Amino acid sequence: MDGVSLSLEPGRIYGLIGPNGSGKTTLFNCITGIERRDAGRVAFNGERIDGLKPYQIALKGIGRTFQVIRVFPELSALENLLVVTRGGLAEAQARALELLRFVKLEGLRNEYAGNLSYGQQKLVEFVRVLMRDPTLILLDEPAAGVNRTLLNDLLDAVRRLRDQGRTVLLVEHDMKVVMGLCETVFVLDHGEKIAEGEPGVIQTDERVIEAYFGR
């Protein structure tokens, strides 16, 4: 990353796009403490978090999904959510069922995660992130490999999170999803931020067009 600066406000959906290798996942890793930056700072709610471990950052209220699905195939959908909880089991189960209902998977709560479709597994991972009630949610390619019906359920859930006052930052290669969902889009190329703005502005930005298609 080279001098990348992002500022996120509560209750908004942001997109982070760029060609392959532009630094999108690296930026997510820096925010969540998986990778250490050489310079600069990461602040959340006015507090520097760049020196914290990943689990400490998660406890501050930042949740994140990954490009590669990370579910436990031999656990049920419900159990996959319960593995990240602390405290009373009854309260955790109620919260997990509420979240499965949030993405229309309550009826599959007892199904082994390994038997679910790829898209359903993505939804399980998505709501597992919500079990800790984060206020900033980072989604890494949420639409990849998801059929249209499940994708619509996921996008509706993201909008409802925004309406609850949460902030969502997503990396996504599906430009239709980005342009239809995000209110502000950041564009990276070779580790630098080359553009920032509303989707309509980004679509016509010459620097963005050149980054994707060349001259």
Task: Identify the role of each PLM range.
Residues M1-R215:
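Glycine-rich phosphate-binding loops of nucleotide-dependent enzymes
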